[in-house]
Amino acid sequence: MYNESPIIRRPSTRIYVGNVPIGDGAPIAVQSMTNTKTTDVAATVAQIRALEKVGADIVRVSVPTMDDAEAFKIIKQSVNVPLVADIHFDYRIALKVAEYGADCLRINPGNIGNEERIRSVVECARDKNIPIRIGVNGGSLEKDLMDKYREPTPEALFESAMRHVDILDRLNFDQFKVSVKASDVFLAVASYRLLAKQIRQPLHLGITEAGGMRAGSVKSAVGLGMLLAEGIGDTLRISLAADPVEEIKVGFDILKSLRIRSRGINFIACPSCSRQEFDVISTVNELERRLEDITTAMDVSIIGCVVNGPGEALVSDIGLTGGHAKSGYYDDGVRQKERFDNNKIIDGLEAKIRAKASMMANRIAITDKTE
């Protein structure tokens, strides 16, 4: 099966956000950010748990005030996933959430303040053994850089990032990652390319303020896909004006499409035409809904007719090819004697997929124990 990614990852140093390794060949971490009021502890904890359920490796939480910092303390004690505290303007909030157990501090060079304030944050992070993310954003560059470049440019984002990389280097602090996000795909991609050539720290990828569910997913897939295909990127966030849970799903779908990292089922399904022998679209939609809980990486092909069905089934863990009245069923590319009535496909195929996923998960567990 042709399932190995040809991508060679950019060499980078290793840091840890909580227990999640970032960089140096570690799996690319998928993260999201809460959109609740942080002071609403119950709502924020519920959202973080929902994100964790769909596979979030890391969750970022905005901490705009000291009241939010106090809420962060309770939130941190209530969840398992590592939390990044998102800090703007007031460096003292970073010091407070570090005391409260933040797993990473995100600071924005455009508004965090002078070098002395950054020094205070760095020394606190060093003392607590937690990393920092230098988070540059095209919408909040330093005033002197906007005066110099007139508008956000790759060079402006790069210069902003390097100013703070240099500060951390002078302070002999290497536990950090960097992002240079922009809402324009080409601006973000060019900025990350400049940064990737200059430093070895892990890079956090994102197209900021990408838009709603559909347009934002497409924009993120294009921009992040360009970078990931070049081996650039160690962690990512899909920024959508949508339920944060969808950000995690889209993030994994992007990684899955590049064969970088897989989680759950990769559905291969035809768009359907008049040759389809069953309703492909409703079948796929219902199976996706029912099987969201499966985390085992596997390929399932659902094709409505015999034109492409057998070929896709050949390279799938489970395959279904539409036939007259009954559809052919494949396991590991081998056609089985069993066939599905076309009006009973969903229940039957769900059972087969769940059994296959369980078997594959057990096989992986046994392999892990013997290695």
From Swiss-Prot:
It is an enzyme of class 1 (oxidoreductase). Binds 1 [4Fe-4S] cluster. One of its GO terms (biological process) is isopentenyl diphosphate biosynthetic process, methylerythritol 4-phosphate pathway. InterPro entries: Dihydropteroate_synth-like_sf, IspG_bac, IspG_bac-typ, NO2/SO3_Rdtase_4Fe4S_sf. Pfam families: GcpE. GO terms for molecular function: 4 iron, 4 sulfur cluster binding; 4-hydroxy-3-methylbut-2-en-1-yl diphosphate synthase activity (ferredoxin); 4-hydroxy-3-methylbut-2-enyl-diphosphate synthase activity (flavodoxin); iron ion binding. Its EC number is 1.17.7.3. Keywords: 4Fe-4S, Iron, Iron-sulfur, Isoprene biosynthesis, Metal-binding, Oxidoreductase. Pathway: Isoprenoid biosynthesis; isopentenyl diphosphate biosynthesis via DXP pathway; isopentenyl diphosphate from 1-deoxy-D-xylulose 5-phosphate: step 5/6. Its cofactor is [4Fe-4S] cluster. Converts 2C-methyl-D-erythritol 2,4-cyclodiphosphate (ME-2,4cPP) into 1-hydroxy-2-methyl-2-(E)-butenyl 4-diphosphate. NCBIfam families: ispG_gcpE, PRK00366.1. PANTHER family: 4-HYDROXY-3-METHYLBUT-2-EN-1-YL DIPHOSPHATE SYNTHASE, 4-HYDROXY-3-METHYLBUT-2-EN-1-YL DIPHOSPHATE SYNTHASE (FERREDOXIN), CHLOROPLASTIC. This is 4-hydroxy-3-methylbut-2-en-1-yl diphosphate synthase (flavodoxin). It comes from Shewanella frigidimarina (strain NCIMB 400). The gene is ispG.
